[in-house]
């Protein structure tokens, strides 16, 4: 359940995929008023983290989805004064995620940029690393 979820990011094409799933998004630089119950910080940049604390309501939650490539200095005065809950999120528990996928409770197809055969895994990893695709799915055949 989510009252007011907002995902902050820096890539318009990635945020558009979330918009298609009816998820509210904002670019790091977009002017938005404070008030989100939950802000998912997915930029991996210090400016995105600071922006997340500006967007979340007092006593709201900031979910840190990505890590920064470099150590980040963090002014804790805003989250302390506003009693903001900070949650780290990496992969999460796999069993509930797999159950939700198998039951069709989560629509992931719009997030998959392409599907390739396992024999083309090396090229798929290179494509995924390029930053030009969201997710690449490897297909493992029974034969």
Place the predicted regions along the sequence by residue.
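Hydrophobic/aromatic beta-strand patches that form the interior of the parallel beta-sheet core
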Residues: 6-8, 26, 40, 63, ...
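Short, acidic/turn-prone active-site loops that include or flank metal/cofactor-
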Residues: 11-13, 28-32, 67-70, 91-92
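Short conserved AdoMet
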Residues: 44, 57-58, 129, 133
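Phosphate-bearing ligand-interacting subdomains
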Residues: 41, 45-47, 121
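C-terminal hydrophobic helical "lid"/dimerization subdomain
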Residues: 12, 50, 95-143
């Amino acid at each position: 359940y989510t009252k007011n979820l907002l995902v902050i990011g820096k890539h318009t094409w990635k945020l558009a995929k979330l918009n298609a799933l009816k998820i509210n998004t904002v670019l790091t630089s977009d002017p938005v008023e404070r008030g989100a119950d939950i802000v998912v910080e997915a930029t991996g940049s210090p400016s995105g983290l600071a922006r997340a604390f500006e967007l979340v309501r007092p006593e709201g939650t900031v979910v840190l989805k990505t890590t920064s490539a470099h150590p980040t200095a963090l002014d804790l005065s805003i989250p302390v004064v506003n009693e903001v809950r900070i949650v780290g999120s990496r992969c999460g528990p796999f069993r509930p995620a797999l159950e939700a996928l198998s039951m069709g409770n989560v629509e992931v197809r719009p997030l998959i940029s392409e599907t390739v055969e396992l024999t083309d895994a090396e090229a798929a990893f290179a494509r995924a690393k390029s930053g030009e695709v969201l997710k690449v799915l490897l297909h493992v055949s029974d034969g």
